[in-house]
Amino acid sequence: MVREEVPVSTRTLQWKCVESRADSKRLYYGRFVLSPLMKGQADTIGIAMRRALLGELEGTCITRAKSDKVPHEYSTVVGIEESVHEILMNLKKMVFRSDLYGTLDASICVRGPRHVTAQDIISPPSVEIVDTTQHIAVLTEPVDLCIELKIERGRGYCTRTQNNYQDGSYPIDAVSMPVRNANHSIHSYGNGNEKQEILFLEIWTNGSLTPKEALYEASRNLIDLFIPFLHAEEQDINRNMEDNLKRASVPFFAFDDGLDNIKREIILKRIFIDQLELPPRTYNCLKRSNIHTLLDLLSKSQEDLMRIEHFRVEDVKQIFDILQKGFTIDLLKNSNQFESR
């Protein structure tokens, strides 16, 4: 049997944004193109990217509201046009922009008559309200509306259990989905075995991320998922990798003197700081300084790290301790100076 040779494109794979617009504060649109791709590749990438965009990205939302003197969720309050349930549904729609993890406190405390909007939410400086005009309630009489809020960062849709009713606290189902919709389409060109494809990717976001930022985050999350397969060939380098994997932590490698620098750099680029299990505050400081991978981190001196806003000596020491436990690279030759400060 004679097999036909299947040609492989020698052109560099490129992507670009061909359209970008903001229809409103809570609706951004972006259209991207990736080409040239071999037959079948566009669908593979398109399906994976769409699922990652809709299910893997994190968002910030209100997860709990508390107000005194409210008998139950479906009750009404004199002087307030909406029922308690309607107010909770309006709070559920609030869109925030934040990189911080953990539970944050916010509040609303106003007096009517007036129109209550997202602008009336008193939130931490680290939390930005995307659309301050979002409607919450209408106070028709001179009554007070005071609500304590819990804001959290999460992923996907999470149904909250109904508890703590006695203290006037009500859970709000978390919708932590910054991407409202994502579609992909494919354009084929060429003939026979030379047929190639162009992937078109459309992304709509809620304003907490731009479509380009969403595309970057989704790509990074997909890379994180495939990293364990890429590391399979490195098992001989570090015999302790199996133990690391059993602990569900990032696979670490011992770089000996014979390891080629190019190979070392490629591996470091594949490991993102998300996998180092850093404390939330340290992680957020690094991200704000555009330190995304282990290669980015190792290229910084301790003086560079200390110049990061809100970074402390203890944070640098903790980073070095985490890396030293997983790598045989000697990162702490001068660790005594941390203790002497």
UniProtKB/Swiss-Prot annotation:
Family recorded in the similarity comment: Belongs to the RNA polymerase alpha chain family.
InterPro entries: DNA-dir_RNA_pol_insert, DNA-dir_RNA_pol_RpoA/D/Rpb3, DNA-dir_RpoA, RBP11-like, RNAP_asu_C, RNApol_insert_sf
Pfam families: RNA_pol_A_bac, RNA_pol_A_CTD, RNA_pol_L
Major subcellular location class: plastid
Assigned GO CC terms: chloroplast; DNA-directed RNA polymerase complex; mitochondrion
Plastid as UniProt keyword: yes
Keyword annotations of the record: Chloroplast, DNA-directed RNA polymerase, Nucleotidyltransferase, Plastid, Transcription, Transferase
Catalytic activity: RNA(n) + a ribonucleoside 5'-triphosphate = RNA(n+1) + diphosphate
Function: DNA-dependent RNA polymerase catalyzes the transcription of DNA into RNA using the four ribonucleoside triphosphates as substrates.
Highest taxon in the source lineage: Eukaryota
Region of interest (Alpha C-terminal domain (alpha-CTD)), residue spans: 266-341
Region annotation Alpha N-terminal domain (alpha-NTD): where it falls in the sequence: 1-233
Enzyme Commission numbers on file: 2.7.7.6
MF-aspect GO terms: DNA binding; DNA-directed RNA polymerase activity; protein dimerization activity
Class of this enzyme: transferase
One example of a Gene Ontology biological process annotation: DNA-templated transcription
Name of encoding gene: rpoA
Comment on protein domains: The N-terminal domain is essential for RNAP assembly and basal transcription, whereas the C-terminal domain is involved in interaction with transcriptional regulators and with upstream promoter elements.
Name of the featured protein: DNA-directed RNA polymerase subunit alpha
Location(s) in or outside the cell: Plastid, Chloroplast
Subunit and partners: In plastids the minimal PEP RNA polymerase catalytic core is composed of four subunits: alpha, beta, beta', and beta''. When a (nuclear-encoded) sigma factor is associated with the core the holoenzyme is formed, which can initiate transcription.
